[in-house]
Each structure stands twice: as structure tokens, then as C-alpha cells.
Amino acid sequence: MAFKVRNAKTLNTMANSWLGKMQIALEYALNRSGPMSMAPSQLGAFARSDAAQTSANIQYHVQPLSLNKFGEPLHPFPAFTASVCNLRPTARGHVRIASSDAAQAPKITSNYLSTEEDRQVAADALRLTRRIVAAPAMQRYEPEEFLPGPTFQTDAELAHAAGNIGTTIFHPVGTCKMGRDDDATAVLDPQLRVRGVVGLRVVDGSVMPLITSGNPNSPIIMIADKAAGLILADRKRAVGSGAAGSANA
């Protein structure tokens, strides 16, 4: 969601001219400070989309800027964006081979908002954002919603708006699931080995059966550390077996 504001500087106005861009670049070059020294999101938060949730199921990234979509210019008025993502989506997409040419990109279908549960979370999250922005502490900035806009009110309208203005958060997982031997949907065994292939493991976010409720960077580092231990243990056993065989021979 995006809101126009007053009585505040945002990157929209600071970087919407060549002079502004030069001032930002100069501040960073001389002092290593200013907008170029900051992460795009200045605020992050975890929240529950509704009272029935037992733990946080949505995550906020708030940026002091606004634009229609990635790659387009910033809006010419001061504004901020409150991006909210569903941490536990129920929709499932797929990745499929496009042809026998290994160099050709696969066909990726995300299926965002394809389940009723995800559409409800989207609608509830937008309503929660409106309540937060309507809090007394925010009123000095006179926030005015313009994306998607106050005319969207019903669950269906809000879910549709989320689909129109939403984008990926770049955390795809689960395309190469790890699982038990009796799980027909698991491509990998519990040791991260590709079933039916000798000497091949997969070690990245694709092995997660379900995404974790937050940024996957740390869990993937942990998976890599665990995989290193598995590989070293297998290597040690193999070397031990070879040494024992030689001695017996």
C-alpha cells in the first residue's frame, strides 16, 4: 500500500530531480551517509493479520518512497509504501521443463493468491495497515492512501487489489522438496540426496518442504552447514570402509 504524506521528506521528493540525485550522491561520497547508505526498507515488523492467528503470519517492509512498479520513476509527491507479505501462503506453484534444451529457461508458475486462505490474509493485511496508518501518531503527516485507494473495501475488492499492485518478495522455496522415504512428493531423501541419482545432493532453499515464517537467508545457511556435515560424515565412512578393506585384503 502507498500513502501520500505532508510535513515529511521522502525519497520521492529528494531524488526526483538531477539536483536531488547529485546531492544524495555527494553526501554519500563525502560522508558515507544519507539515502545511499540506507537499506530500501527503513522499518520491518511482524504481525498477525487477524486475532485468530496464534503467531505472526505477515511481515511488513516500509519504505520512504513510492512508485507504480519496480523500474518505474518515483512519484513526484512525498509518500511512503507499506509492503506486507504473507509468511505462510497456502498457494502452490510449479516449475516445469520447457523443452529438451537445457539452456532454455523453465516455465515458472507462482499461483499467487490462488487459494481462499491467501486472499483472506491479503484482505485482512490491507485492513490492518489502514488501522496502523490511522493511528494518532501518524496524523501529523496527514497520510492519504492512493494505492490501492480507499474505494476498495470488501474482501474480494481488497484481494483483487493485492493481486494488481502486489509483487514477489524474492523468497522462492520448495521446488526440490526433502522428505521421508514414504513421501512420494519428496525429490530428496533426508540426507539431501536426489532419489535415484548417485553422488548428487541439492543444498539451497528449494529443499524446504514449507517456507519459514520470515526471511529464509539464515535457515538456508543452516541447511548448508548441516549438508556440509552430512557430506563430511559420508566421506569419512567411505574412507574408513576403504581402509578396512585394504587391511583385510
Model-predicted regions and their roles:
Residues G44-D50, I58, Q63-F70, F77-E144:
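C-terminal segments that line or cap access tunnels to active or ligand-binding sites in enzymes
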Residues I211-I231:
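A conserved FAD-binding loop/helix module that cradles the flavin
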Residues Q59-K69, P76-S83, P136-I211, N217, ...:
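A glycine-rich dinucleotide-binding beta-alpha-beta segment and adjacent secondary-structure elements
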Residues A8, A52, L65-L67, L87-P89, ...:
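Short, glycine-/Ser/Thr-/acidic-enriched flexible segments
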Residues A2, F46, R96, K177, ...:
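Structured core elements
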Residues G93-V95, A105-I108, V187-D189, L210-G214:
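Cytochrome P450 core scaffold surrounding the K-helix E-X-X-R motif
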Residues P40, E117-D124, L128, Q153, ...:
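Generic recognition of stable, solvent-exposed alpha-helical segments in well-folded globular domains
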Residues M1-P76, R131-P136, Q153-A156, H160, ...:
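Mid-to-C-terminal "cap/lid" subdomains and adjacent gly/pro-rich loops that border
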